[in-house]
């Protein structure tokens, strides 16, 4: 499941062959501040685009819902139903209940922190797909999957519940993303989609009694590394995970395309019996080229304490530099015209071209000539 926070990322998800995408509109989603691109008027277009490419479309309505939000929530869920959105992703029972009332499919968010089969049985009345708590290890996931099969725990469709888990991307320092630090420090609630990323800053630790600053080995003491599971995708599949969710609605289209392609290839390799160390190493190198804060395994393999990044921002092995913008595309000959206005281009440079219909295209500069009258780049 690919994260989509812009039309460029939607096009990139299509290019990468994603089976589904998830996105938010305006308010009432957990990326309302950082990925606020789409509106309620875009729902039909997004649903139609996904249908044309054989993808499912999932709309996040996963914030805390207050009484004053109920009319807006009804409007959004009604619009999703009318537009043909595949499902809404919910964390509040008010959203789940209303969606079921009008016949809109529901998926359950990790914000619910579902950690056992008994809780799953309760929520099964609302949804066929459930994101389990991200703090679970794979043994715990496998136990829940075993009970789903043995006790035939089904959702509204009558089919057995499918387990969805995050496989890649940023992790919140708080349990299942329920963070109050941003609200406390900046008066912007992460649980209302307005996280100010306070945890990503560097900090000093000082003893209040002695005023002595403690010597710590990492000043980014609340900023987790990014999750990466591609090297043990086989174990996740064996544990019963059936939907793999990639975090990153606020990240660029090149991130979406690269990460989706790598994980799709990994799942295919597992199914074909060609999931090898050599392929894992190649996927790792590709994943390092796009935005990341360093990587760790999350809690899936039994680790109980998080691993913290040592960088502010991205630790990607490749750095993007804005060079110029597209001017015109000549569709009859497949040639694009670009205005190079911000940086020089050299033969051998890796070029990234993005756009609402372009998605993310990676090319290499094979020819570059420049004179007073004209610049010509060949790729």
Please place each PLM-identified region on the residue numbering.
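N-terminal basic/disordered segments at the start of proteins
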Residues: 1-20
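Active-site beta->alpha loop and helix N-cap motifs at the rims of alpha/beta catalytic domains
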Residues: 9, 39-100, 105-110
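Catalytic alpha/beta core domains of metabolic enzymes, predominantly
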Residues: 107-242, 256-259
């Amino acid at each position: 499941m690919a994260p989509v926070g812009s039309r460029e990322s939607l096009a990139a998800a299509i290019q990468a062959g994603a089976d589904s995408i998830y996105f938010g509109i305006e308010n009432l989603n957990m990326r309302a501040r950082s990925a606020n691109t789409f509106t309620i008027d875009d729902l039909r277009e997004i649903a139609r685009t996904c249908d044309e490419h054989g993808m499912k479309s999932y709309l996040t309505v996963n914030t805390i819902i207050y009484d004053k939000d109920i009319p807006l929530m009804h409007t959004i869920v009604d619009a999703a139903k009318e537009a043909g959105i595949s499902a809404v992703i919910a964390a509040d029972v008010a959203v789940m209940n209303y969606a079921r009332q009008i016949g809109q499919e529901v998926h359950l968010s990790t914000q619910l922190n579902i950690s056992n089969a008994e809780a799953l049985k309760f929520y099964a009345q609302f949804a066929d797909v459930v994101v389990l708590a991200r703090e679970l290890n794979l043994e715990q996931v496998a136990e829940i999957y075993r009970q789903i099969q043995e006790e035939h725990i089904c959702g509204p469709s009558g089919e057995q519940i499918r387990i969805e888990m995050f496989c890649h991307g940023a992790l919140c320092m708080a349990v299942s993303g329920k963070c109050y630090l941003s609200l406390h420090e900046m008066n912007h609630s992460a649980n209302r989609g307005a996280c100010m990323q306070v945890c990503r800053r560097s900090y000093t630790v000082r003893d209040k009694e002695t005023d002595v600053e403690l010597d710590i080995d990492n000043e980014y003491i609340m900023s987790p590394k990014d999750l990466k599971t591609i090297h043990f995708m086989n174990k996740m599949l064996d544990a019963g995970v059936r939907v793999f969710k990639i975090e990153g609605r606020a990240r660029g289209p090149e991130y979406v395309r690269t990460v989706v392609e790598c994980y799709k290839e990994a799942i295919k390799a597992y199914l074909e019996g060609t999931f090898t160390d050599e392929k894992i190493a190649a996927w790792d190198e590709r994943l390092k080229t796009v935005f990341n804060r360093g990587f760790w395994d999350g809690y899936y393999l039994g680790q109980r304490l998080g691993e913290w990044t040592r960088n502010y921002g991205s630790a990607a092995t490749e750095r993007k530099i804005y060079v110029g913008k597209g001017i015109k595309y000549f569709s009859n000959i497949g040639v694009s015209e670009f205005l190079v206005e911000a940086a020089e281009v050299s033969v051998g440079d890796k070029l990234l071209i993005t756009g609402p219909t372009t998605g993310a295209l990676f090319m290499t500069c094979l020819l570059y000539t420049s004179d007073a009258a004209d610049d010509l780049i060949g790729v």
